[in-house]
UniProtKB/Swiss-Prot annotation:
PROSITE patterns: RIBOSOMAL_L2. The lineage of its organism: Bacteria, Bacillati, Bacillota, Bacilli, Bacillales. InterPro entries: NA-bd_OB-fold (IPR012340), Rib_uL2_dom2 (IPR014722), Ribosomal_uL2 (IPR002171), Ribosomal_uL2_bac/org-type (IPR005880), Ribosomal_uL2_C (IPR022669), Ribosomal_uL2_CS (IPR022671), Ribosomal_uL2_dom3 (IPR014726), Ribosomal_uL2_RNA-bd_dom (IPR022666). GO terms for cellular component: large ribosomal subunit. One of its GO terms (biological process) is cytoplasmic translation. NCBIfam families: rplB_bact. Gene3D superfamilies: 2.30.30.30, Nucleic acid-binding proteins, Ribosomal protein L2, domain 3. Keywords: Ribonucleoprotein, Ribosomal protein, RNA-binding, rRNA-binding. This is Large ribosomal subunit protein uL2. Belongs to the universal ribosomal protein uL2 family. Residues 1-20, 219-276 are annotated as: Disordered. One of the primary rRNA binding proteins. Required for association of the 30S and 50S subunits to form the 70S ribosome, for tRNA binding and peptide bond formation. It has been suggested to have peptidyltransferase activity; this is somewhat controversial. Makes several contacts with the 16S rRNA in the 70S ribosome. Residues 7-20 have a biased composition (Polar residues). GO terms for molecular function: rRNA binding; structural constituent of ribosome; transferase activity.
Length: 276
């Protein structure tokens, strides 16, 4: 997809860019694959804020995505490429020959009319999903499972991809987008190709109001708060934080402080840590 620029008719327009949506083929989603989506505004079931800076935004409907890709041996044809307001990647509507309709993440270069397949016997081509053990070394993949049958959990954002590096017994070595090299069970599935809409990261929001349309609320600096609200708060005028290192709102060290638990169960699957 390309990036659309605007004439600087207003200050908000001056630096704003949007997607040109050239790949999108319809603006009418498949009704049978929609579900209601209520606003959470970052609150949990007790009404307490667990994720800050969320709230408002345009009303959305959830698109039910097939992350499991378990329609084995049944050919499907790409009917549409669609925009999904709930994720950075585009989605593709697949019509299977048995009458089933499903949405999948749209990989790069997937086009309307192309045929896709799932299962161990599927060919190595864009959009097909198969167990990692059946994918050749060097292949670029996305939507990777961590447990067989659970559905893809890794590499789902726009423009991301992973690469199969090798096979060791019942595990497959995969290099993730971050640079981390990880062991994944060979029975886990992945889809071939890179996730599409790779120009998503180049989009400039341009103005505060557009962030609010996306459901993002302002981020206030701790140094301008009161001491009751943040460890950096208080003081006369523009004061230093008064601590030897920056702190989170809950008094924990931040900015470079490692938060991953030591001796975590999944450590044994990480062959090389991500790039710093």
């Amino acid at each position: 997809m390309g990036i659309k620029k605007y004439n600087p008719t207003t200050n908000g327009r001056r630096n704003m860019t949007t997607n040109d949506f050239a790949e999108i083929t319809t603006d009418r989603p498949e009704k049978s694959l929609l579900a209601p989506l209520s606003k959470k505004a970052g609150r949990n079931n007790q009404g307490k804020i667990t994720v800050r800076h969320q709230g408002g935004g345009h009303k959305r409907q959830y698109r039910i995505i097939d992350f499991k890709r378990n329609e084995d041996g049944i050919p499907g044809r790409v009917a549409t490429i669609e925009y999904d307001p709930n994720r950075s990647a585009n989605i593709a509507l697949i019509n299977y020959v048995d009458g089933e309709k499903r949405y999948i993440l749209a990989p790069k270069n997937l086009e309307v009319g192309m045929e896709i397949m799932s299962g161990a016997e599927a060919d190595i081509k864009i959009g097909n999903a198969l167990p990692l053990i059946n994918i050749p070394v060097g292949t670029v993949v996305h939507n990777i499972e961590l447990k067989p049958g659970r559905g893809g959990q890794l590499v789902r954002s726009a423009g991301t991809s992973a690469q199969v590096l090798g096979k060791e017994g019942k595990y497959v070595l995969v290099r993730l987008t971050s640079g981390e090299v990880r062991l994944v069970l060979s029975a886990c599935r992945a889809a071939v190709g890179q996730v599409g809409n790779e120009s998503h990261e180049l989009i400039k929001i341009g103005k505060a109001g557009r962030s609010r349309w996306l459901g993002k609320r302002p981020t206030v600096r701790g140094s301008v708060m009161n001491p009751v609200d943040h460890p950096h708060g208080g003081g006369e005028g523009r004061s230093p934080i008064g601590r030897k290192s920056p702190m989170s709102p809950w008094g924990k060290p931040t900015l470079g402080f490692k938060t991953r638990k030591k001796n975590k169960a999944s450590d044994k699957f990480i062959v090389r840590r991500r790039k710093k």
